[in-house]
Regions:
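N-terminal signal peptide c-region/cleavage motif recognized by signal peptidases
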Residues: 12-17
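Bilobed "Venus flytrap"/periplasmic-binding protein-like clamshell domains
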Residues: 19-44, 48-50, 106-170, 174, ...
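Ligand-binding clefts/hinges and TM-proximal coupling segments of bilobed small-molecule sensing domains
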Residues: 126-145, 220-282, 292
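Short beta-strand-centered segments that line the small-molecule binding cleft or hinge
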Residues: 80-85, 96-102
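Bacterial N-terminal signal peptides that target proteins for export
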Residues: 1-8
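Pocket-lining segment of extracytoplasmic ligand-binding domains
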Residues: 76-78, 85-88, 114-116, 153-155, ...
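N-terminal (or domain-start) structured segment
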Residues: 18-82, 87-90
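An extracytoplasmic/periplasmic, membrane-proximal ligand-sensing/linker region
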Residues: 33, 167, 174-175, 183-201, ...
């Protein structure tokens, strides 16, 4: 975070020292991605990027919007809500957020113990499900969408209040809940494999009506079939789950040359990114400038144009 004296005189980012902050969650899959971005940008991009963990994007997006933190990371559905000031941050738009890069597809859903009798989202009726998420509203939004796929709401479950994703992870590990939000490739899946004897993703309903019910709550998402394979803990048979994109974003006033260095580092070092976490398995440099419905920062646009990746 830049000093108050510098902040009073210049645009966001410590332009002289090239030190920038990256807002992220404290644990979980988002933090895994953020640490990978920060490592590659710091090692290869000529910009020192330091992660600044907070409870969730609802906490760090206002700071990025003001320029107190330079960069942020989140999924694209959440970013849309943040920019518009809807659902996650009611009536608090964040108009100064700009895209830097589309990072990876994010395969997510709800997991249960491998030996659980629950097989589909519909089986969660009457089961203990994490709820509340006062510290990170994204959890409430996602589970609302998941349950909608099964024609249910939180009222159809036994709600177990959790304030945050870390508390949700712990509640599931302690079997205070029957399920937890999870993402293919996240570190917690391996932890649960050991502690719980295995985990398994619950099946989504892929029918058009059921898939549309999810996207009403989780925009820019889709239901897809994922087949078993290396790094896909929790997917033992072909399983329908949710997917959306993850994004790196920035304050609109961060200098173009700084954003360009970040975008260039991501483009030029895919192997280094993939080495940081299984979450990067499907990272594709050709998709860095993908249109996700949010304007891109001109510093990133220039890089993608120079690489022939900007198609609009």
């Amino acid at each position: 975070m830049r000093s108050l004296l510098v902040g009073a005189l210049m645009a966001p980012t410590l332009a002289l020292s090239q030190v920038v902050g990256l807002g992220t969650t404290p644990v979980g899959a988002t933090f895994q991605l953020a640490t990978g971005v920060a490592k590659v940008v710091s090692d290869k991009g000529g910009v020192q990027m330091r992660t600044q963990p907070m409870a969730g994007a609802a906490q760090y997006a206002p700071l990025v919007n003001k320029g107190d933190i330079d960069f942020g990371i989140s999924n694209v559905p959440e970013l849309h809500y943040l920019v518009k000031g809807e659902v996650i941050v009611d009536n608090r738009p964040h108009p100064d957020l700009r895209m830097v890069a589309r990072l990876v597809p994010w395969y997510n859903g709800l997991v249960v113990k491998k030996d659980s009798p629950l097989r589909t989202l519909k089986d969660l009726k009457g089961q203990p499900v994490p709820a509340g998420f006062t510290g990170n509203p994204l959890g409430r939004v996602l589970i609302t969408g998941y349950l909608a796929n099964a024609g249910m709401t939180f009222d159809d479950t036994r709600q177990v209040p959790v304030p945050s994703f870390p508390r949700m992870f712990d509640a599931f590990k302690q079997q205070q809940t029957a399920t937890s939000i999870a993402t293919i490739g996240m570190a917690q899946l391996k932890e649960w494999e050991s502690a719980l004897g295995g985990v398994r993703f619950l099946q989504f309903d892929p029918s058009p009506a059921a898939a549309a019910a999810v996207t009403r709550h989780v925009p820019h998402s889709r239901v897809v079939e994922v087949k078993p394979g290396p790094g896909k803990t929790g997917v033992d048979t072909p399983t329908h789950i949710l997917v959306y994109d993850y994004a790196l974003w920035v304050n609109a006033r961060v200098p173009e040359e700084v954003v360009a260095k970040v975008a260039q580092a991501l483009h030029d070092h895919p192997a280094e990114l993939k080495a940081t976490s299984p979450l990067w398995a499907e990272f594709d440099t050709a998709q860095l400038g993908r249109d996700v419905g949010i304007p891109y920062h001109p510093g990133a646009v220039k890089v993608y144009q120079s690489k022939g990746l900007w198609k609009r």
